[in-house]
């Protein structure tokens, strides 16, 4: 039952890497760095911050917690790592390592947070949330790569920059919106439909410029 949760990000990375001209080997150091950072972070939380969040009746409180814990803090850390490790002059974007870093991080972080939470574990957390988080890093990485592509950043027209910026905001905000709505009793069928729609959105952005 837990295999999907534990294997989605590793398998997703290798599928992503096969579509990349450089293959998986070039990005494995970034994956392992993401895994290492995640393991250190999870160990710190386990020993020093053994805190489990109890869903609130307030949509906005739930949204704020989910966004900070699962989106803002992890992705900010991975973005900083991107800028620290991206030194090669021939790299096509400042964020080309963003997806492998995030895949490594969430491969440890998400199972750790979910499996150390409440029991029994709801279907949403075991299946929908991993899909949502994977879709988020897939879409966000592709959009960031396009926004910060070194070859064309200076010639990209403003309308495309605005479109990509809005798409990035949506990609980052929607996961917390959907989970917060689920916490306050959103319709299960609607939740599944929106999860699949978000996956389709991410898949669409994963093939931009191809």
Model-assigned labels for residue ranges:
Residues 1-210:
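Hydrophobic alpha-helical segments at protein termini of multi-pass membrane proteins
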